[in-house]
């Protein structure tokens, strides 16, 4: 019998109690950003409108750098891949992800299930500090409120969203320097990544020794078919998430289980923190 923490408290927005959002200039000054092609350090180009590794250039959109591999962006039409047969395995992969993300992927931000989850996630993350990378950040101005004020925040998302600064790129190919982050966050995003093992490997790569991977996800007990799900690649069982983290050499430090905020009995909310020891 799975035991759950009892908690009916909901998240309350408070912009005064937020992590500090780093800017593009901050990221460049600290040498954090890397080319997704060469993994060389990125700097502003001479025209200050692009980033460059000295050979390849990367555009920005609303001051957010577009750090997809050039193999992908060279095939874009209006910022997306056309739904045509692709011979490249990378283009096939990105096209599958693009198709999956065309529907509504989250409960409304102010719905009770969303607010229950955000409170639980916020409580789970209370001990974090340093620079955190939010993989699949969605809305950074809201996401920063989930983390302690002593944190500095960078978000990465495959899409440009509302125009707030974030890195536009893939969690499976993080354009981030190795050993530079204090935490990597997957807040209900890991199940949207087809190759979630590679995404976790990338998270471990960019973490400093002692850094944390935080995963919040549904864990399924039954009815886990994907044949009726148009937006997720995975309906994880708990052992899949724990096994993936431990398989990468991480140590589980904290694990919390809550009843599904949508009151389903075939799944529950799982919150896990794991640390990098070497």
Each predicted region: which residue ranges?
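Conserved class I S-adenosyl-L-methionine
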Residues: 214-242
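A short glycine-rich, Lys/Arg-flanked "PGG" loop and its adjoining helix->strand segment in the class I
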Residues: 197-212
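Core SAM-dependent methyltransferase catalytic element
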Residues: 248, 254-278
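Conserved alpha-helix/loop element of class I SAM-dependent methyltransferases that forms part
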Residues: 104-130
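N-terminal, positively charged/glycine-rich alpha-helical extensions of SAM-dependent methyltransferases
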Residues: 4-103
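Short catalytic micro-motifs in class I SAM-dependent methyltransferases
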Residues: 188-189
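A conserved beta-strand element that flanks and buttresses the S-adenosyl-L-methionine
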Residues: 185
């Amino acid at each position: 019998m799975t035991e759950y923490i009892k908690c009916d408290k909901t998240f309350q927005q408070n912009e005064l109690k937020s992590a500090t959002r780093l800017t593009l200039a901050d990221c460049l000054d600290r040498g954090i950003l890397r080319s997704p092609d060469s993994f060389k350090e990125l700097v502003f180009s001479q025209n200050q409108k692009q980033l460059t590794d000295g050979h390849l250039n990367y555009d920005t959109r609303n001051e957010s750098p577009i750090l997809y591999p050039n193999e992908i962006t060279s095939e874009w039409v209006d910022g997306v891949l056309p739904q045509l047969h692709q011979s490249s395995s990378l283009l096939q992969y990105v096209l599958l992800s693009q198709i999956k993300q065309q529907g509504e992927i989250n409960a409304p931000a102010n719905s009770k299930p969303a607010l229950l989850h955000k409170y639980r996630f916020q409580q789970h993350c209370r001990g974090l500090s340093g620079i955190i990378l939010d993989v699949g950040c969605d809305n950074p101005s809201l996401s920063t409120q989930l983390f302690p004020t002593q944190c500095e925040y960078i978000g990465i998302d495959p899409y440009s969203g509302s125009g707030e600064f974030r890195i536009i790129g893939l969690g499976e190919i993080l354009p981030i320097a190795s050993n530079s982050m204090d935490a990597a966050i997957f807040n209900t995003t890991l199940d949207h990544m087809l190759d979630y093992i590679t995404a976790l490997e990338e998270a471990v790569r960019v973490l400093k020794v002692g850094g944390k991977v935080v995963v919040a996800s549904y864990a399924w007990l039954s009815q886990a078919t994907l044949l009726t799900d148009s937006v997720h690649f995975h309906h994880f069982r708990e052992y899949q998430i724990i096994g993936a983290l431990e398989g990468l050499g991480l140590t589980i430090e904290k694990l919390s289980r809550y009843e599904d905020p949508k009151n389903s009995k075939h799944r529950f909310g799982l919150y896990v923190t794991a640390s990098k020891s070497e």
